[in-house]
Curated annotation (Swiss-Prot):
GO terms for biological process: regulation of pH. This is Na(+)/H(+) antiporter NhaA. The gene is nhaA. Residues 32-58, 117-122, 177-180, 223, 273-286, 351-357 are periplasmic. One of its GO terms (cellular component) is plasma membrane. Its main location: membrane. It comes from Escherichia coli O139:H28 (strain E24377A / ETEC). Keywords: Antiport, Cell inner membrane, Cell membrane, Ion transport, Membrane, Sodium, Sodium transport, Transmembrane, Transmembrane helix, Transport. The chain crosses the membrane at residues 12-31, 59-80, 97-116, 123-130, 155-176, 181-200, 205-222, 224-236, 254-272, 287-310, 340-350, 358-380.
Length: 388
């Protein structure tokens, strides 16, 4: 019991559980004895009906769209705190992750096109390596425990959120044909209500969560990635203390263990089970997976590092307090963990063309993401001194 308490008290425990869940998913998805059970679990239908409103999704989509909205709510709360009171409080500090994210989307896409521009079919997947899986990137960072400066963690969070917002915009503009304007209208009204609640000084967290559920439902029905709702709600919950209590900080404290020990491991288990059946070396070295691997493993860190260097040289932004440029470069490598968002874009790009292309894209995403995780973790482990 003492050892168990010590483990869960460790800053690295959440990351360790997430990695174990991902490995378990890979084993189960590729084992003849368990692959059927694994996929049956993910395809289990779950229906929610309130009056005429009906949401009918399988277990995988409930995990990715609903539970991960809670994770993004927590991320929104943490980034807001740093924007208002912490390491992103000045304009130049806040500009740094924005500039980094822009570079981290442009360069991987260009590198992918360098491999695939001549093929009009695979060319459609240009946005695949532009995405970052914030959950897995933060999970790998968590393995380093307390040696990670808070400012570096917040930089990764802010960068990944902007990256995700960019990916959502790309999906809406280039990969979505049937956006529901009515649902987007409801979402806009819900956001306006959240803003009014904040301006009027309403401090009951439950009211924001209730409006957030309406917002989440509207965003889900609109065809846009529903997890965006979590970030928006997090930004509107009041941070300012009154009588020694802050609604945002209190909710952040409540959500942390649920996200670290339930939501993120479940997310990893549901999404890491990529089948390796039929994988050959010839297929792996074809232009589609090679373009994705190059985009994630080379394009991401190159784009982030280059744009950060330019921002510093032109005095457009400052390094986060207590961090070094080498640490920023290592975080850039971690951002090459594209995984679930990249897989989602691949399914949109190739789903109506050739299912086999999705499998090769998944393989490229898997190789690029795992390589980025291992190299990024190793570099940071060398660059970060253990806390005393």
């Amino acid at each position: 019991m003492k050892h168990l308490h010590r483990f869960f008290s460790s800053d690295a425990s959440g990351g360790i559980i997430l990695i174990i869940a991902a490995i378990l998913a890979m084993i189960m998805a590729n084992s003849g004895a368990t692959s059927g059970w694994y996929h049956d679990f993910l395809e289990t239908p779950v229906q929610l009906r309130v009056g005429s409103l009906e949401i009918n999704k399988n277990m995988l989509l409930w995990i990715n769209d609903a539970l991960m909205a809670v994770f993004f709510l927590l991320v929104g709360l943490e980034v807001k705190r740093e924007l208002m009171q912490g390491s992103l409080a000045s304009l130049r500090q806040a500009a740094f992750p924005v500039i980094a994210a822009i570079g981290g989307m442009i360069v991987p896409a260009l590198l992918y096109l360098a491999f695939n521009y001549a093929d009009p079919i695979t060319r459609e997947g240009w946005a695949i390596p532009a995405a970052t899986d914030i959950a897995f990137a933060l999970g790998v960072l968590a393995l380093l425990g307390s040696r990670v400066p808070l400012a570096l963690k917040i930089f990764l969070m802010a960068l990944a959120i902007i990256d995700d917002l960019g990916a959502i915009i790309i999906i809406a503009l280039f990969y979505t044909n049937d956006l529901s304007m009515a649902s987007l209208g409801v979402a806009a009204v819900a956001i306006a209500v959240l803003a009014v609640l904040n301006l009027c000084g309403v401090r009951r967290t439950g009211v924001y969560i209730l409006v957030g559920v309406v917002l989440w439902t509207a965003v889900l029905k609109s065809g846009v990635h529903a997890t965006l709702a979590g970030v928006i709600v997090g930004f509107f919950i009041p941070l300012k203390e009154k009588h020694g209590r802050s609604p945002a900080k209190r909710l952040e404290h409540v959500l942390h263990p649920w996200v670290a020990y339930l939501i993120l491991p479940l997310f990893a288990f549901a999404n890491a089970g990529v089948s390796l059946q039929g994988v050959t070396l010839d297929g792996l070295t074809s232009i589609l997976p090679l373009g994705i691997i190059a985009g994630l493993l080379i394009g991401k860190p190159l784009g982030i590092s280059l744009f950060c260097w330019l921002a510093l040289r032109l005095k457009l932004a400052h390094l986060p307090e207590g961090t070094t440029y080498q640490q920023i470069m290592a975080v850039g490598i971690l951002c090459g963990i594209g995984f679930t968002m990249s897989i989602f874009i691949a399914s949109l790009a190739f789903g109506s063309v050739d299912p086999e292309l999705i499998n090769w894209a998944k393989l490229g995403i898997l190789v690029g993401s795992i390589s980025s995780a291992v190299i990024g973790y190793s570099w940071l482990r060398v660059r970060l001194r253990p806390s005393v």
